[in-house]
Amino acid sequence: MKKTTLALSALALSLGLALSPLSATAAETSSATTAQQMPSLAPMLEKVMPSVVSINVEGSTTVNTPRMPRNFQQFFGDDSPFCQEGSPFQSSPFCQGGQGGNGGGQQQKFMALGSGVIIDADKGYVVTNNHVVDNATVIKVQLSDGRKFDAKMVGKDPRSDIALIQIQNPKNLTAIKMADSDALRVGDYTVAIGNPFGLGETVTSGIVSALGRSGLNAENYENFIQTDAAINRGNSGGALVNLNGELIGINTAILAPDGGNIGIGFAIPSNMVKNLTSQMVEYGQVKRGELGIMGTELNSELAKAMKVDAQRGAFVSQVLPNSSAAKAGIKAGDVITSLNGKPISSFAALRAQVGTMPVGSKLTLGLLRDGKQVNVNLELQQSSQNQVDSSSIFNGIEGAEMSNKGKDQGVVVNNVKTGTPAAQIGLKKGDVIIGANQQAVKNIAELRKVLDSKPSVLALNIQRGDSTIYLLMQ
């Protein structure tokens, strides 16, 4: 096969050399015209790349020094000859800790590289990831044209991994235009721009692989855009743009067992970035409002168990007293299907979107309750930051001692053994089970009837004090 290919190539070369000068010129012109008509990202990138910057950071962080055996601590005190100038042990953690290396904290300097995006040219605002500039004492920004500026911190939010810095004495900057990230669809083209490994501005392309990704860190507000555009170390804080050159996300994380790119990258949606940075500009921080609910994802099995005619949404398992949700009349067992007229795909998506909204924001939530669509209006209250035991999904309810409460008043939990499945799902002494899988439970016999059907998901309706909650298990 190789010989045939080479022969054909040689033949084509011979014929080409035999062409007249006029024919050769025509061929060259045709080739040039074809090249000019080929689609390219270059015109868009020429406009966008000046708004993407490289960020160099210097800072210090506290690290724990190793704890040495007690018998050796006397030899490594501040006055010890082992810790004096010229000693090979002087720079060791045992001498640097100041207390004989007994496990105390020590300040350690670091340098880091990342990327950022200019969102306000006049004021010099640059958005990046919190993990790029966290603990920074010196922040320097380099533009695509090589100019360098000092920058200062404006605000940061570890829970969303967004930070806002400001270029000092900005001149002739180019700001990026933000797109509506809610309009994104799986399959839309994406372009990632950043500074991987400190190489300088680099461009990669791909598509939107998925929307509404979460679960990287359960405590954070996550509603990621997933893309297969290559995102590597140093790309953090860089831009994810559409083919119009508009910002659709801030690159923030990759899923990579060995630290390299395998085509699974995550970006924070531009609408989320817009809400957070506007608060940082105004307050220097994010002042979150909260709904005051606990919940979980609505999947097909839970929908079947709860007899809900929906496949996607946020299932409300508990409403906190005196919260925004409680005042609006939201109840345990409701399914939140929309926020301000836009569909809600999961509890994580609801949490992330509400988590970017400031105190006092007015919302309209679409609910599915008893098979009917209900809309409620509410105003977000300030986050209480109270830690509430959430209801998780575990197997079984073994470990709970129960008895009938009066005549047909439900099943009361008399005791819960520590470490048992009943304790794990959140059952507590004094709880009263009044329903299971949307069926009323008046006594143990009725509860046993539901359990004997061996449902794939069990949703217990619990009366706890003055509140009604749901505990979910499968």
From Swiss-Prot:
Substrate binds at residues 58, 131, 161, 234-236, 252-256, 291-295. Keywords: Cell inner membrane, Cell membrane, Disulfide bond, Hydrolase, Membrane, Protease, Repeat, Serine protease, Signal, Stress response. Gene3D superfamilies: 2.30.42.10, 2.40.10.120. GO terms for biological process: chaperone-mediated protein folding; protein folding; protein quality control for misfolded or incompletely synthesized proteins; proteolysis; response to heat; response to oxidative stress; response to temperature stimulus. Disruption phenotype: Decreased induction of Cpx two-component regulatory system. Increased accumulation of periplasmic accessory protein CpxP, increased accumulation and toxicity of overexpressed, misfolded periplasmic proteins. Increased resistance to hydroxyurea, probably due to decreased degradation of misfolded proteins which eventually leads to decreased OH radical formation. The active site is at 131 (charge relay system), 161 (charge relay system), 236 (charge relay system). Changing residue 131 to R: Loss of peptidase activity with no detectable changes in secondary structure. Its main location: membrane. It is an enzyme of class 3 (hydrolase). The keyword Secreted does not apply. Pfam families: PDZ, Trypsin_2. Its EC number is 3.4.21.107. Inhibited by diisopropylfluorophosphate (DFP). Changing residue 236 to A: Loss of peptidase activity with no detectable changes in secondary structure. One of its GO terms (molecular function) is serine-type endopeptidase activity. One of its GO terms (cellular component) is plasma membrane. It catalyses: Acts on substrates that are at least partially unfolded. The cleavage site P1 residue is normally between a pair of hydrophobic residues, such as Val-|-Val. Induction: By heat shock. Transcriptionally up-regulated by sigma-E factor and the Cpx two-component signal transduction pathway. It is a peripheral membrane protein. It comes from the Bacteria. Optimum temperature is around 55 degrees Celsius. In the range from 37 to 55 degrees Celsius, the proteolytic activity rapidly increases with temperature. DegP is indispensable for bacterial survival at temperatures above 42 degrees Celsius, however is also able to digest its natural substrates in a reducing environment at temperatures as low as 20 degrees Celsius. DegP can reversibly switch between different oligomeric forms that represent inactive (6-mer) and active (12- and 24-mer) protease states. Substrate binding triggers the conversion of the resting DegP trimer and hexamer into catalytically active 12- and 24-mers. The conversion of 6-mer (DegP6) into 12-mer (DegP12) or 24-mer (DegP24) is crucial in regulating protease activity. PANTHER family: SERINE PROTEASE FAMILY S1C HTRA-RELATED, SERINE PROTEASE HTRA2, MITOCHONDRIAL. This is Periplasmic serine endoprotease DegP. It comes from Escherichia coli (strain K12).
